[in-house]
Amino acid sequence: MPWPGRGHINPMLNLCKSLVRRDPNLTVTFVVTEEWLGFIGSDPKPNRIHFATLPNIIPSELVRANDFIAFIDAVLTRLEEPFEQLLDRLNSPPTAIIADTYIIWAVRVGTKRNIPVASFWTTSATILSLFINSDLLASHGHFPIEPSESKLDEIVDYIPGLSPTRLSDLQILHGYSHQVFNIFKKSFGELYKAKYLLFPSAYELEPKAIDFFTSKFDFPVYSTGPLIPLEELSVGNENRELDYFKWLDEQPESSVLYISQGSFLSVSEAQMEEIVVGVREAGVKFFWVARGGELKLKEALEGSLGVVVSWCDQLRVLCHAAIGGFWTHCGYNSTLEGICSGVPLLTFPVFWDQFLNAKMIVEEWRVGMGIERKKQMELLIVSDEIKELVKRFMDGESEEGKEMRRRTCDLSEICRGAVAKGGSSDANIDAFIKDITKIV
């Protein structure tokens, strides 16, 4: 049972694919709304993953960003009953329920029916530690805070698994994100009643945070990722005939900046105008995915050195030899896709966990660069700053650029090793399967 959103459904589906590929006796019932079945129902998947639907009684994916708080409330209050009805219709009760951590009621449903629940947290273990330890933040006077407070330069150095971090980098603690956090805080309480905790990360990316959870909970904690379907890239090359791949094939190696601001919340119109001017004036080749504003963006970028598309196969594009950098909103899926593809990341976070992901990319893993706001909580990053950063980021001949690309390749190898035979995540997925199949 994933949270109904692209950044949650994708890693959950990739986890389920990994499970059924390993055990021929496993069958997965993957629960989505009728609307989401329309989005993903035709995507390739193993035969032993079956979709089951809940009615469209929550706001549409197409408008949920208009009132995200109302969308969250709908998921948390309207879907529990139809989910239970779906369980009643199954031929036999499931061996286990894997539910997104944000689905607060899933653990309650499993407990009532004596079905063990594995809580699947779809972003970094580090930010979950921040959430779980919000009382520590409060005791230090760091939660909640207002963006204007002078203490934003103070350092948070007491959260397990989180390296010393400026309060201003934890934007989840104030403003709109604070409202969202207060709603989800209940789900972190339910987490203690789960039977397993799963992460989409590799242990090697976040050892301190994952060690914290392993010691904190008296149930198994498994890092299972990166849950990036690299094995699917060798199957079906029909996409090579698409015009955008033909364009990429014509570009020099590592010369193109891939730009994607994600599939949900994006930047303001004023900020987008600054980004457009900055990228255009940087004079680099670019491949820009614009969900919803393709025509307008094409007009604004007419005569520049790139292409604009409304959609692309992101992982295949990132793995193309022409791609030399990835401008990203820092959603965790995209972050892991970039790292696994060996592509440096240019961070432009917008919301929620993305700011902390950006910090880890730039400061901890050192596989990218980010905009440095000259003023705390600066709302608009101007085109001149963007232009200079893009030029610096795409300069593969500078010592800084060479080092960043070397580190990215090294981290890519580490992540691929985690999911390879005998790797840390490979072993964890095997252990999880043994756990849930022992229950039968």
From Swiss-Prot:
UDP-alpha-D-glucose binds at residues 263, 312-314, 329-337, 351-354. It holds the Pfam family UDPGT. GO terms for molecular function: UDP-glycosyltransferase activity. It is an enzyme of class 2 (transferase). InterPro entries: UDP_glucos_trans (IPR002213). The keyword Glycosyltransferase applies. The keyword Lyase does not apply. SUPFAM superfamilies: UDP-Glycosyltransferase/glycogen phosphorylase (SSF53756). Its EC number is 2.4.1.-. CDD domains: GT1_Gtf-like. Signal peptide: none annotated. Keywords: Glycosyltransferase, Transferase. Belongs to the UDP-glycosyltransferase family. This is UDP-glycosyltransferase 87A1. It comes from Arabidopsis thaliana (Mouse-ear cress). The gene is UGT87A1.
